[in-house]
Structures are given as structure tokens and as C-alpha cells.
Amino acid sequence: MMLFDLNQQAAELPEAWRSAVLGRVGAANIKVLRMDARSIADEVHDYSEGLLVISGHLRLQVAGEEVVVRAGQLYQAAAGVPHRVLPGSEGTLVIVDLPEDQVPSLG
């Protein structure tokens, strides 16, 4: 078992928006990164992604709409759906990669 100070882990990373894998839970990667105010171009993944803001806020654009994820909130970016980071995000972000074959069917 390990205890992580997520804000400290993010602060010690050499570069913003470059994640470090802290570990795995089942098939999912648990990653941490430090956000800064710059924008990030559209991303599309073949897996779902959980975006958990630990401190600060994350500004996303998804399907033409702005989504603001605040500290303590989790946003799930669906597989195959383009999303981009808008300027002005800051703080600590935890990313949980959910491979498509690991996402339970709701139907």
C-alpha cells in the first residue's frame, strides 16, 4: 500500500501537462499531472478517461460546449469523443484511463 500527496506529486513533475503513472487499479492507470494556463489541442482516445480535479479547475471544450471541472469533481470523457483543454486551467489533475473493454455496459 502507498500513500500519495497528489498536489506534491504534481508539483514535482518536470513539466506541466506531462502525466506520471502512480499505479494501476485493475486495468486502469492512475496518473497525476500539473495543469497550467495553456490550451491543449483536441484529443481523441480509444478508451474512456476519468478526469478528477484535485485542486484548481480544468476548462474543457466537448462537442462545442465548455465544461468546467472544479476541485472535487470528476468528468468522464467518453472513448472516441474529441475534447480539448481551453486556456486558463490550473492545479492538479488525476487521470484514470478506462480501457473501453473495462467500461461496464449500462444496457
Model regions and ranges:
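A short, N-terminal "cap"/entry segment at the start of jelly-roll beta-barrel domains
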Residues: 1-33, 39
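Residues that act as N-cap/strand-start positions at coil-to-secondary-structure junctions
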Residues: 16-17, 45, 54, 77-79
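Short histidine-centered beta-strand/loop micro-motifs
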Residues: 21, 33, 40-45, 62, ...
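Structural motif
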Residues: 29, 50, 57-59, 66, ...
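Short, conserved beta-strand element in jelly-roll/cupin
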Residues: 35, 44-60
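A cytosolic small-molecule/anion-sensing beta-strand core signal
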Residues: 54-55, 70-71, 89
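Short acidic-glycine-tyrosine-enriched beta hairpin
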Residues: 64-79
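Ligand-binding loop in jelly-roll beta-barrel domains
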Residues: 79-106
